[in-house]
Each structure stands twice: as structure tokens, then as C-alpha cells.
Amino acid sequence: MTGSLSIVADEQIPLAEQAFSKFGNVTLVDGRSINNSLIKNTDILLVRSVTKVNELLLKNSNLKFLGSATSGVDHIDIDYLKSSKIYFSYSPGSNSQSVAEYVLNSLIVAKKKSCIPFSKMKVGIIGFGHIGSKVKKISIEENLVIFSCIC
């Protein structure tokens, strides 16, 4: 790549400028201020969940790639991306370890308040996606009794 791409990135995405500047000119902006006129001649758009990505934002733009630094896609009109032939990538599971550790930390707090030892605690896990599978792994390492439901 010769560094000729126009890239707009949410300023809250850590290291976006360092990671993408070798591909082109990176403009960092407030994710809430990203609008159609700002990205009209942009090749790559990097967003977080604060940016609603839909036809209103993308219509008549030259966008070729959308990257989202999120694990979900509620803020993105994927059908519009497909019909517009805009490539898309997001980050499913990217926060799963942190969330699993938060869940287990909550159990530690509950343990302290109830004086129930870990060996007597029971953990219910619904689903074994990115987070549930990590909660299960940590729970097993801590010898917790696990009840699971793959729904």
C-alpha cells in the first residue's frame, strides 16, 4: 500500500492512527460527529458503537471498508453494507475475557457478603459463547459447581 487511502477513525479507538497511518491519511474525529459530508470521499471508516452506520451516513460515499471496534453490530445496517458492496469487520469476543473476569469478581463480592466459601457456591451459565465459555473455564479452575444451559 502506498499510503494513498483516506481513513476516518473515531478518536477513542486506541492506537488507530498508529495502526492505520501506514495505509493512508488518518483523520481522528469524535465518533458522535461522524456524518455523511465528513466521509463522502473516505475509503475506510473505523467506528465504535456511538456511530450509527446506515444509509443516511453512507449514501453516495466512496467507502470501501467499515471496521467497528465493537463486539456487537446493533449500530450497523449490515444489509445496507452488503447491498453497497462495503466490506465490514467487527470484533466479536474482544471484551469477553474482561466481562468473564467481571462476572467472577461479582461472585467474589457475593462470597464476601454471604460468607459462603467458593467450594459451596454454584454458578449458572446460560450459553457458551465468547463470555460463557470463559466464565466456565475460570469457574472450573476455582472449583465452583457449574449448572449450564446451552440455549
Pin down the residues of each PLM region.
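A short, well-structured beta->alpha microelement
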Residues: 25-37
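A short, Lys/Arg-enriched amphipathic alpha-helix followed by its capping loop at the start of a domain
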Residues: 15-26
